UniProtKB/Swiss-Prot annotation:
It is found in: Cytoplasm, Cytoskeleton, Microtubule organizing center, Centrosome, Centriole; Cytoplasm, Cytoskeleton, Spindle; Nucleus. Residues 487-502 have a biased composition (Basic residues). Disulfide bonds: none annotated. Belongs to the CEP162 family. Residues 18-42, 170-231, 476-504 are annotated as: Disordered. InterPro entries: CEP162-like. Transmembrane segments: none annotated. PANTHER family: CENTROSOMAL PROTEIN OF 162 KDA. Promotes ectopic assembly of transition zone components at cilia tips when targeted outside distal ends of centrioles, generating extra-long cilia with strikingly swollen tips. It comes from the Eukaryota. This is Centrosomal protein of 162 kDa. Residues 208-231 have a biased composition (Basic and acidic residues). Keywords: Cilium biogenesis/degradation, Coiled coil, Cytoplasm, Cytoskeleton, Microtubule, Nucleus, Phosphoprotein.
Amino acid sequence: MANCSQEELDEEFEQFMKELSDDSFENSDKTARQSKKEMKKKDTVPWWITEDDFKDDGLLGTNVSYLKTKKTSQPVMEIEEESAEKIQFLKSSGTSLLSTDSLETNELVVSELNHSSLGVGLDTLEEQEEKEQFFARLEKGLTSSIDYSRLNKELDSNDSTHFKALHSNQANAELTDDEHENESKHEELAENYSDDFEDEYVGAPLTTKDEEMPSKENSKSEKISVPKQEEEKTGMLANVVLLDSLDSVAEVNLDEQDKITPKPRCLPEMTENEMTGTGVSYGQSSSDVEALHQAYCHIAHSLGDEDKQKIESNTVEDIKSSVKGHPQENEENSKNISTMESDLPTVEELMKPIRIDSFGISGFDLQPVSSEKVAERKETEFFSSLPLKMNPNILSQDSQHVNLFFDKNDENVILQKTTNESMENSCPQVTEVTATEEHVDKMYLNILRKKITVNSSSLSQDDKINKTYRSQLSSEEEGAVMGKQVPYKKARSAPPLLKRKPQSGLYASVRSSGYGKPSSPLKMFSTLEKKTSEDIIKSKNLRSISTSNQPRKKEILSGTKLIKPAALDKPAHKTESCLSTRKKSENPTETDSCIQFQTDSLGYCGENKEKKLLMFKRVQEAEDKWRGAQALIEQIKATFSEKEKELENKLEELKKQQEKELFKLNQDNYILQAKLSSFEETNKKQRWLHFGEAADPVTGEKLKQIQKEIQEQETLLQGYQQENERLYNQVKDLQEQNKKNEERMFKENQSLFSEVASLKEQMHKSRFLSQVVEDSEPTRNQNFTDLLAELRMAQKEKDSLLEDIKRLKQDKQALEVDFEKMKKERDQAKDQIAYVTGEKLYEIKILEETHKQEISRLQKRLQWYAENQELLDKDALRLREANEEIEKLKLEIEKLKAESGNPSIRQKIRLKDKAADAKKIQDLERQVKEMEGILKRRYPNSLPALILAASAAGDTVDKNTVEFMEKRIKKLEADLEGKDEDAKKSLRTMEQQFQKMKIQYEQRLEQQEQLLACKLNQHDSPRIKALEKELDDIKEAHQITVRNLEAEIDVLKHQNAELDVKKNDKDDEDFQSIEFQVEQAHAKAKLVRLNEELAAKKREIQDLSKTVERLQKDRRMMLSNQNSKGREEMSAKRAKKDVLHSSKGNANSFPGTLDSKLYQPHTFTDSHVSEVLQENYRLKNELEGLISEKNELKMKSEAVMNQFENSMRRVKEDTAAHIASLKASHQREIEKLLCQNAVENSSSKVAELNRKIATQEVLIRHFQSQVNELQSKQESLVVSEVREEILQKEITKLLEELREAKENHTPEMKHFVGLEKKIKQMEMRHAQREQELQQIIQQTHQVVETEQNKEVEKWKRLAQLKNRELEKFRTELDSILDVLRELHRQGVVVPVAFADEMNAPEY
C-alpha cells in the first residue's frame, strides 16, 4: 500500500466518503473513474476569491445549477467536448444529493461535504447524527399551529402557477405525489433538482438539458437586480427547504424560456395536478420563507464545498430572484387546494372569474339571466381570446360583444366593465390607483344620471332587474356563509384530480408570453381586495347561481382559472386601453344626450318635478355618504400602508443584523474548516506514507494531538450549531409576529371592504328606486323634446359657425396686414443686404491686400531666421570641435604632468632613448654610405646617382617651402572663411538691432499718437462743443431776426402798394400835396438804406460762415478723423445753402414798389373832395405810425446786429487763442518727436560703440583668464624648479659618494669610471649639437614668421581692396535702383534683356 499511486488513494478516499453518505454508495464505481478527470481540474479556493476566477473551470461541482447567477459571478458556460462526461458524472455522483427528501437533509449536508476537493473538512459519524437530530427538530418546529393558508389566499392576486404549468412539457407531467417514494425515479432525473431542495420555486416542471443555455443567457440580464447584500457565498444548505412547498425548482427557467420565446403555441390537455403545480401548501408566506432562506444561505458557508460555491450561489440567487419576481406563486398553491372533500366551491373559486387580475375583462362574465348556455360559451370565448398578443379577430369579437351589451341596455354590465377597466389599468402601476378610483366615481355618477333621465321602455325589464336583485341578496347570503366556512380550514395535500375538460372557444389554446412584471401583493393589496366584494355582489346579481348548479360552475371556473396575471404586460395594456377608450367614447355621448333630454323634459313636464327633486336629493345624499366612506377608506389605507412600511423596515433591519452575525459566524467557521482541512491533509498523508511500517511513538503522539484538536473543533462546531438554532428560533419568532400583524391588518381590510359593500348596496337601492319612479312617467313628449333639442343644437351650431366666420375674416385681415409688413421688411432686408455686401466686399479686398503684405513680410522674416539658424548651427559645430580639442589637450596636459612628476625617471628614459636612437642613426648612416658607395662604383654616371646628388643638394629646401606655403594658404583660407562668417554675423546682428529699433520706433509712434488723440479729445472736445453750440444759437437767432424782418418788409410792401394806389388816384385828381411827396421820398430812401443794410448783414454772415468752415477744417486736420470730417462738411454745406436761400429770398422779396401797379384814371371819379381829404389825413397818420414802427424795428435790428457782431468777435478771438495754443502744443510735440528720433538715430552709433566695448571686455576677460592660468603655471614651475634643484643637489651628493666608493674599489671600477667619462663627453657633444640645431631651427622659424607676416599683410591689403570695391559696387547698385524706382514711378518701361542675349558669347 505504501507504493500506491495518488489516483488510487483518491479513489479509496472517495469510496470512504461515499460510505459516510448512505445514498451515494451505490454509484461509487462511476464516480471513482470520472472523478479522476474532474479532481485534476479542481483546486481549493479560499472564500475571499470571487467567482469570476472560476470562469474557465466549466462545470465545477456535482450539483450543477442552471439557474440565475449572482452579480459577481459570471454564467457558467458549457464546453461541448466535456458535456457528456460531466452529465454522466452528475448522474453518478449527484443523484443522491438531489433525489433525497427534505427530511434527509443531514445526508445531503454530509454528501455535500464529501464531494468537496481533497482535504476540505471531513465530518465524523457523530457529527452526522447531531445534524440529523438538529434538522429533524427544525422540521418539527416548522409544523406550527398557525394557519397561513388563508392569508396566502387573500393576499395573492396574481395566480401564475397554472399558467406556468401549461408551459411545461408533457414529459414532465409524470411528477405526482408518489415521486418521493422511489429513489430510482429521481436518479433518472438527476440533472434537475428535486422539489424539496428549493424554497420559493413553485408550479413549474424540472428543466432538461435543452433549457440550460437559455437560462444562462437570461441569468446575465438578471444580475443587475440582485442586491449587494447577497454577494456573500452560500453553501449547500441554501438548497435545504423545510417542507414549505413541494413546488418545482426550475420555475425560473420556465420564466426565462418564456422571455426568450414569447410566441403563443398550442398546448396539450393538462391534469389538475399539472394545473396546480404540485398542489401542496404548508402554510408559509413568501416573506417568511425568504427570511429563512437568507439565514440558511449564510449558515451554509460553514458546511459548503469550496469548488461548488459558484453553482450553489447560483441556486440561492435564483431562489431570491424568484421570490422577488414571482411572489404570488407560492400562495397560488394554497388557493388551488382549498376544500377538495366538500362539494361547495370556495370564495376564491367563486371570485376567480370576477377578479381584476384575470385580464380585467371580468365584466364580460356577467350575462343576463335569460341567456344561459350561450352566455357561458361566450364567456369562455372571452377569457380565451385575450392573451398578450391580441389578434384583430379578437378585437372585433370583443367590440361586437360590447355593442351587444349596449343594445341590451344592460347598465350593470357597463358599470362592471368600466370599473374593471379602470382597475385593470391601475394594476400594473400602483401609483395610478387614486386616479382610477376617481374615474370609477365619475362613471358611476354618469350612469346614475342616465338612470334618472332615461325612460325605461318596458316594465318587464324592471321586473327582471328586481328578480335579479332578490337573487343577488340570496346569493350574497350564501357567499357569506361560504366565506365563513372556508377560509379557516387548514390546507392539506390534495389527491390527484380528475382531468378537466378542455377549454371551449376559438382561442382556448393560446397562451400568454409570460414575461410580464407581476405586481406584488403588498402593493396591490389595498386596490385589488377592495374590488373583490363588489365583484362578488355583481356576479351573483346577474348570475344568481344556486347550489344545484355547482358542477356547471366548476366547469366554468376550470376554464377561467387559466387566465394569468402575466397579462398585465404592455401588449395587454394596449388592447385594454383600446377597449376602454371605445367604451368611454360611447358612454359620454349617451349621458350627454340623456342630460339634454332630462333638461327638456323637466322644462316641459311640471308634474314629476317634485319626485325628481326628491330622487336627486336621495342620490346626492347617497353619493355624499359614499364619498365620505371612500375618504375614510383612503385614510385607513394610508395608515395601513404606513404600518406595513414600518413593519417592513423593522424586518429589513432585523434581517441585516442577522446577516451580519451569520457572516461573521461563517467567516469563523471557514477559518476553522481551513485549519481542520490542513490537519486532515497532513494526517492523511502521514497515514498513507507510513502505511505498512512500524508505528512510531512519535506518530502516536501526533495522532493523539490531532484527535484532541478534532475534538476541540467538534465542540466549537456544536457551539456554532447551538448558535444557529438560537438564530433560527429568533427568525421564527419574527415571522410569527409578522404573520400576526398581517392577520390583524387583513381583518381591518375585510371590515373596510364590508363597509364599502354596504355603501354600494345603498347606491343600488337608490338607483333602482329612481328607475321605478322614471318608469311611471309618460313617454308621449319624447319626440317633441328630441326635435326641440335638435333645433337648439342646430341654432347653436349656426351661431358658432357665424362666430367662426367673423373670427376667420378678422384673422384674414390681420394676416393680410402682416403679409404687407413682411413684404416691406423683405424689401428693406434686400436693400440692406445689397448695401452690406458691397461694403463687405470692399473690406474683404482691403483685408486681402493687408494679409498679402503681412504674408510677404513674414516670409522674409522666416528666410532671415532660417539663414540665422544655419549660422548658429555652424557656430555650434565649431564650438563642439573646440571643446573636443580642449578635452584632448587637457588629457595630454594631464599625461605630461604625470610624466613630469618624477623627472629622474624621465631623464633616465630619455637618456636610454637617445643612446638607442644614436646607435640606430649611426647604423643607418653607415648603411646609406655603403649603399651610395656601391651605387657610385657600379654606375658612376647613372640617373640614380645624379638624382641622389640633386636631392642631396636642394630637394629638401623645396619640399619644405612647398609644404610650408600650402599650410599657410590653408590657414589663410580658414581665416578668410572665419572673417566672412564674422562679417555675416555682424550683418545679422545689425539687422536684428535695426528690426528691434524699428519695432520700438513704431511702438513709440503708436503710443505718441494715442496720447495725442487722448489729449486732443480731452482738451479740445469740450471747447469745440461749446463753440458749436454758440454757433448754432447765433444761427438760430439770426434766422429768427431774418424771418421777422422779412415779415415786416412784406407788411410794408403791402402798405406801400396801397399808398401807391391812393397816390395815383390823388395825382389823377391833383389832390397830392408837396409834403406827401417829400414824405414818400423819405420813405423810399429809408427802404433803400434798409435793403443795403440787409445786404451788408448777409455778407457779414457769409464771411462768418466761411471763417467757421475754415476753423472746422483746421480742427479736422488736427484730429485727422475721417468721420468727423464728413460730418463737418455736411454742416458747412447746409450753412452755405441756408445763406444762399436767405439771400435769394431777400433779393426776391423787394420787387419794384412803384412799378408794380398800373395807373387807373376812373377809380375816384365819383368820390367827394371831403372824403378824399379825410382819407388823406388818415393815411398820413398811418404813414407816421408806420415810420415810427420802422424806426423802432431799425433800432432793434441794429441792437441785434451789434450783439451778433460782438458774439462773432468773441468767437473769433476764442478760436484764434485756441488755434495759437494748438499750434504751440503741436510745435512742442513735433520738437519732442524730433528729439526722440535724433536720440534713437544717435542710439545706433551708441549701440555700435557699446558693442565694441562689449567685445573689448570679452577679450579683456579672455586675456585675464589666460594671465591667471599663466600665473598658476608659473607658480607650479617655480615649485618644480625648486624641487629639481633639491633633487640635483641630492644627485650630486650621491654621485660624490659613488665616486668615492668607486675609487676605493678595484681597477675594473676605474675602467668603468673611464667609460663613464667618455660617455659624459659624448653627451656633452650631443648637447652642443642639439643647441646648434635649436639655434638653426629658431633662425628658420624667424625667417618663416617674417615671410608669413608679409603674406598676411598682402592678403589683408587684398581683402581691404575687395571690401572697398564691394562697397563701391553696393553704392552704385543703390543708385541704379533709385534711378529705376524713379523711372518706374514716372511710368517709364525699362526693356529687359532676353536670356539668349544675356548669355551670348563674347568674341
